[in-house]
């Protein structure tokens, strides 16, 4: 029996570990990682027609319309859908078994557009909510360091003064202050709760305790997914460590 491609959407507050868990899931389950932020930056840097339209909004300090962001994400999802269909028709073997999306949707309007698409091509899709306390977010973000070259994220407990990959001196984000972080948490809650309520009503929401260590969070996510939908592939668990297991590391994004 053919296994339905796995499609996950990962959501959570700043510092909840979305980036780390997305990398772990993509690596260990052979999922394509789709980041809406990366799609936006790539479109602008490549000066595509859509990128030019996005840049015009950003240059004016305006919020991007739901339909514009959806158009960008939809292009990528359509590529994924076409690839999945091709595999079914021609029995081609590809490394990806599905995809994980982060950074989208941010509004109920976006969620409805996405749901209409996914119900047609990935009907068993799930939303992974990384639920984390305000105190833990504050603790993580005030102790994180970033590589200005590769954008790798490390925490103070790891003891690095330089990026182990680039050998560039690590820096702090200027907005990683308690006051700004608390404001970002409140903004996240106000913007995201309606989206979470929408997905909860569709019975697609899986809530995971993200206060736990990275390794435990990852294992809890796997436990919450139907085993028939994935196969673990032992690879390097994320970009900031070289282990060949799926125990993860202590960095958080």
Curated annotation (Swiss-Prot):
GO terms for biological process: AMP salvage. Pathway: Purine metabolism; AMP biosynthesis via salvage pathway; AMP from ADP: step 1/1. InterPro entries: Adenyl_kin_sub, Adenylat/UMP-CMP_kin, Adenylat_kinase_CS, P-loop_NTPase. GO terms for molecular function: adenylate kinase activity; ATP binding; metal ion binding. PROSITE patterns: ADENYLATE_KINASE. AMP binds at residues 36, 41, 62-64, 103-106, 110, 173, 184. The keyword Nucleotide-binding applies. Residues 35-64 are annotated as: NMP. It holds the Pfam family ADK. It catalyses: AMP + ATP = 2 ADP. Keywords: ATP-binding, Cytoplasm, Kinase, Metal-binding, Nucleotide biosynthesis, Nucleotide-binding, Transferase, Zinc. Residues 143-176 are annotated as: LID. CDD domains: ADK (cd01428). Its main location: cytoplasm. GO terms for cellular component: cytoplasm. Its EC number is 2.7.4.3. Catalyzes the reversible transfer of the terminal phosphate group between ATP and AMP. Plays an important role in cellular energy homeostasis and in adenine nucleotide metabolism. Consists of three domains, a large central CORE domain and two small peripheral domains, NMPbind and LID, which undergo movements during catalysis. The LID domain closes over the site of phosphoryl transfer upon ATP binding. Assembling and dissambling the active center during each catalytic cycle provides an effective means to prevent ATP hydrolysis. Some bacteria have evolved a zinc-coordinating structure that stabilizes the LID domain. PANTHER family: NUCLEOTIDE KINASE. This is Adenylate kinase. The gene is adk.
């Amino acid at each position: 029996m053919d296994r339905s491609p796995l499609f996950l959407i990962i959501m959570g507050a700043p510092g909840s570990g979305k980036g780390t868990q997305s990398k772990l899931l993509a690596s260990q389950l052979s999922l394509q990682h789709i980041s809406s932020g990366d799609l936006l930056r790539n479109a602008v840097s490549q000066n595509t027609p859509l990128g030019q339209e996005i840049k015009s909004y950003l240059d004016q300090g305006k919020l991007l319309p739901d339909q514009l962001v959806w158009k960008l994400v939809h292009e990528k999802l359509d590529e994924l859908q076409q690839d999945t269909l091709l595999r079914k028709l021609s029995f081609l073997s590809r490394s990806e078994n599905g995809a994980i999306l982060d950074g989208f949707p941010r509004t109920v309007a976006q969620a409805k557009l996405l749901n209409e698409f996914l119900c047609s091509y990935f009907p068993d899709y799930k939303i992974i909510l990384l639920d984390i306390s305000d105190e833990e977010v504050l603790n993580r973000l005030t102790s994180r360091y970033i590589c200005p070259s590769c954008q790798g994220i490390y925490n103070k407990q790891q003891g690095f003064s330089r990026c182990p990959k680039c050998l560039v001196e690590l820096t702090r984000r200027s907005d990683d202050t308690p006051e700004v972080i608390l404001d970002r948490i409140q903004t996240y809650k106000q913007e995201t709760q309606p989206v979470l309520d929408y997905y909860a009503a569709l019975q697609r929401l899986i809530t995971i305790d993200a206060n736990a260590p990275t390794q435990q969070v990852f294992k809890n996510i796997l436990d919450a997914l139907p085993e028939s939908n994935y196969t673990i592939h032992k690879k390097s668990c994320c970009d900031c460590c070289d282990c060949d297991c799926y125990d993860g590391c202590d960095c958080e994004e």
